[in-house]
Amino acid sequence: MSDEPIFEEEMGETELREEAMNWWQRGYQAQMRQQLDEAIEHYTRSIEIFPTAEAYTFRGWAKSLQGKLDEAIEECIKAIEVDPDYGNPYNDIGAYLIQKGDMRGAIPWLERAFDTNGYECPFYPRFNLGRVYEEFGDLLKAVNLYKEAYDLNPNYKQALLAFRRLQARLN
């Protein structure tokens, strides 16, 4: 085995994916330490090696934490272009639009997140959509969405609290 560095041009798809994942993991670790600029650099390196929906989505999340919501939305759109079945960016766009005060604009994005197969946290878009309908005064729809979110993840206490709060208002 040679001590020569392996250049990306010489790597196969599997190796490129693995290398990109290593950079993504570095980015995630930096983000968890609140080192957002470093995280963005690592996510960017991951994308340069092998673009993935995860890297774009998480780079968007890091940018959102810097208050760059429009850039975060752009990153999520790139993620969807790479993998339309990855659910996180749909929910994230909805959440960023909620933060921007565009409740109506958030609805189709959150609803699309329901229908994706590649989403490990399907309770988030239901909770976020519940927030939208609560804001619009449709408390029955909101309480049902909070309940769905809680049913999908009984450890998601925020959904349980919102469900109980609205249930009490409706009674």
Stretches with model-predicted labels:
Residues D3-N22, T116-E120:
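TPR-adjacent "capping" and linker segments in tetratricopeptide-repeat scaffold/adaptor proteins
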Residues R17, F50-P51, P84, G118-E120, ...:
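Short coil turns that delineate tetratricopeptide repeat
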Residues L16-E54, F58, L65:
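Alpha-helical segment of the N-proximal tetratricopeptide repeat
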Residues I47, I80, F114-T116, Y150, ...:
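A conserved position within tetratricopeptide repeats
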Residues M32-H42, Q66-K78, K100-D115, F136-L145, ...:
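Structural signature of tandem alpha-helical TPR/SEL1-like repeats
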Residues N22, A55-Y56, P89, F123-P125, ...:
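TPR alpha-solenoid repeat register
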